[in-house]
Amino acid sequence: MSYQGSWDKRGEWLELIPGKSIAGQADREEAARQWLLETVGMPEKLYRKLRHERGIEWRGDRLRLILFPYREYGVEPVWHELEVLYEDDFCLVANKPAGINVHGDSTGGEELTLNHAVAAYYQASGLHTAVRPIHRLDKDTTGPVLYAKNEYAQLKLDEDMREKKIARIYAAIVQGQVQDGLTTIDLPIGKDRHHRSRRRVSLTGQQAVTHILSVERSRYASLLRLRLETGRTHQIRVHMSHMGHPLIGDSLYGGNARPFGRQALHGERLIFAHPLTGEQIEVLAPWPEDMLQLKEDSLFLS
């Protein structure tokens, strides 16, 4: 379900044109309700909220929805250079560098996060909305992170994540030569009771599925493209280590840290459906310099 017509953002309001078959109904309110829920795909939770807050109104043949209200960022804006890979009124995709988390931990520390940088970007753009990351990346993993810029987008994208409709393609450089027969790793992942930060393959863990899309081999290492079907903490790192091919630089899971200093893992592509229009959006994130150098280094890939 999606909206295929024209739309305009006017301040806090989104204006849609449902068409004469809806606008001309004797009971326009009920016709609009059915159209929003059954054709556009608006989550019923949000529809009820907008109705309660008088956030739905007709203006001529246009149906207006308050989808862009003023909201606190939810995190302090802290300026940090931010590479924006994609942006419209509903979504933002930021390219996360290595060395920062997407969001803070429960201790509420002062460490800079990607959320802080996104809040500062919103502030500089004159946008007042909550910072809403749809997924996360490990601190030292690079690549695209998807943000919803309003509650409607958040509800739709969260649903798509749960239903595994958002594709995340990663590039990883691992130790050893991965053989062609290894195409899917379906092994549950749980916490390692002996190490606070580690995860491990565990029969009592949560289902975790990683698909290997392609393999390029050198004498010492392999370059993999992988797609996550699930999104468990450290999933690619745990799965590849368990298969005997830890990521280069990933000392937490048995990788040799000396030539790189972090796990050689980069989110290369993010593919999702636009929350309003349903248009398929594919975002490519350029490789960081350290990954490019590692790829070109003849010690690993030639």
List PLM regions with ranges:
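Conserved hydrophobic positions within beta-strands
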Residues: 84, 174, 211-214, 247
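Homeobox/homeodomain signature
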Residues: 4-6, 32, 46, 74, ...
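Short edge beta-strand segments in beta-sheet-rich domains
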Residues: 165-169, 184, 207, 260, ...
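Short Pro/Gly-enriched beta-strand edge/turn motifs at strand-loop
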Residues: 65-67, 193-196, 207, 250-256
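Glycine-centered flexibility sites
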Residues: 99, 143, 164, 176, ...
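RNA pseudouridine synthases
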Residues: 1-184, 292
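The conserved catalytic core of RNA pseudouridine synthases
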Residues: 127, 133-158, 187-243, 267-302
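Pseudouridine synthases involved in rRNA/tRNA modification
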Residues: 1-53, 80, 229, 237-302
